[in-house]
Amino acid sequence: MSGANPARGEATLCVGDRLMTVRPSFAALVAAESETGPLLALVDRAAEGRLTLAEMEALLWHCLVDRPETMARATLGEALLAQGLGAAMPAIRAILRQALAGVQ
């Protein structure tokens, strides 16, 4: 992997021993929205500090690039807790920013 490109709205996220790229593509955001509900409502909840762990996991899961087929979703959830939710916030912010503003 060549790393995240912030100009494309990408960020990095450490999952276990892997540094992975998070890319909030249209398809990924549609998939996440089908699970979490409307993205604008999700952004509102995030702004109010009411984003749930399940919502964070869903956003990240659908936006992970080149996710190994053998990776279980629970692995992502465990990584979020192991490193602390604060470590995932740059990637979450990148996803929400992309949903609101698009790529500049």
PLM-predicted stretches and their roles:
Residues 23-24:
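Short linear motifs in exposed loops
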Residues 1-14, 19, 34-51, 65-104:
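Charged interaction scaffolds used for protein-protein
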